[in-house]
UniProtKB/Swiss-Prot annotation:
HAMAP family: Ribosomal_uL16. GO terms for molecular function: rRNA binding; structural constituent of ribosome; tRNA binding. The gene is rplP. GO terms for biological process: translation. Pfam families: Ribosomal_L16. Belongs to the universal ribosomal protein uL16 family. This is Large ribosomal subunit protein uL16. The lineage of its organism: Bacteria, Pseudomonadati, Pseudomonadota, Gammaproteobacteria, Alteromonadales.
Length: 136
């Protein structure tokens, strides 16, 4: 699963997921899966969607993952009293703003790409849409 190799600080503030997205265009492949809603993806969800797409296209074509989980989420163990410091890092997430391209695909037909992205979208907690590369 995806997670940073090293970080300057182990734990992070909760923060707020506001603002506009970077990476709103399809840059590497022909087709993309774009987030319509706002939320956060865990490393497990990113990997589950990737596996679903890879299995559906039967290892032909190429897939790019355009998001990376770089925010640690902590939690305290069950039945532990409040206080005594922040909990341990449990998992990693990536904060998603509307318009962010999550995955890209190349080397497959549009129909196959649509089906693969539909399977991937079922694994994600966000509303997504299918996009194609805009040629100017």
């Amino acid at each position: 699963m995806l997670q940073p190799k090293r970080m300057k600080f182990r734990k992070m503030f909760k923060g707020r997921n506001r603002g506009l997205a970077n990476g709103t265009e399809v840059s590497f492949g022909e087709f993309g899966l774009k987030a319509v809603g706002r939320g956060r993806l865990t490393a497990r969800q990113i990997e589950a969607a990737r596996r679903a797409m890879t299995r559906h296209i039967k290892r032909q074509g190429q897939i790019w993952i355009r998001v990376f989980p770089d925010k640690p989420i902590t939690s305290k163990p069950l039945e532990v009293r409040m206080g005594k410091g922040k909990g341990n890092v449990e998992y990693w997430v990536c904060q998603i703003q509307p318009g962010k391209v999550l995955y890209e695909m190349n080397g497959v037909s549009e129909e196959l790409a649509r089906e693969a992205f539909t399977l991937a979208a079922a694994k994600l907690p966000l509303k997504t849409t299918f996009v194609t590369k805009s040629v100017m």
